[in-house]
Amino acid sequence: MSDGYHLWSERYDRELKDIFDVQDEITLAVVEALKVKLMGETKSAVLRRYTDDAEVYELYLKGRYYFNKYTPEGWMKALEFFEQAIQKEPEYALAYAGKARALTSCSYHGLLSYREIVPAWKAAISRALELDQNLVEAHIAQASFYFYHEWNWEAAEREYRKAIELNPNNSDAHQLYGTFLASRNRFDQAISEVRKAFELDPLSLHARFNAGFIFWFDNRLDEATSQVQKMIELEPKSRRGAKRFAGIHGA
């Protein structure tokens, strides 16, 4: 399979007494099926549990779901769910990292002012790293803030690379690093990173969206069109996909 979607399938019939045990079992089964070799800290990062509270975990997942819609309403909704998770479990590192990243998106897209989000962002990212200095999501959140708000290219690249070093199998880190590299006119490296993101997560809408941007910016219009078409196939109602397609073709 060069660019398809069916990599692995299996049926699981389990009593959902402990969703986290089932999650670990499925994760390891996928790793084995795809012949991914997880070593030391990478394996620990993949399997680490940051909460044993299913309700808190559900709030976090809802935050991730809405964040990944990449819409103004989605980012604001994500912020609410991450905050709810923190209120229920103040030691939940992932929720702080999610909050920090959602704040960055809300500010970058004009939903909240930069001045308004900075104290909350600093508090959230500081707490996330205090709870786990090797939290991949926290380093991604830092990188995004340095990139989009501080324009501190050196710090942004350092944090993206740190996230990938901590977990080379994190699709999000690769595709976001690819976008950063494209902004610095390092297109060959950028394309390598987004291709890695596809290998890890062929269904990632955001990776396809960013790949379309990278290819378009490098004047590779056929490849840009192909990536956006794949995005639209995955999510036919995607407004972002339609807008990016129109932008590529000057509509």
Regions found by a protein language model. Give the residues of each.
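Acidic, proline/glycine-rich low-complexity intrinsically disordered segments
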Residues: 1-251
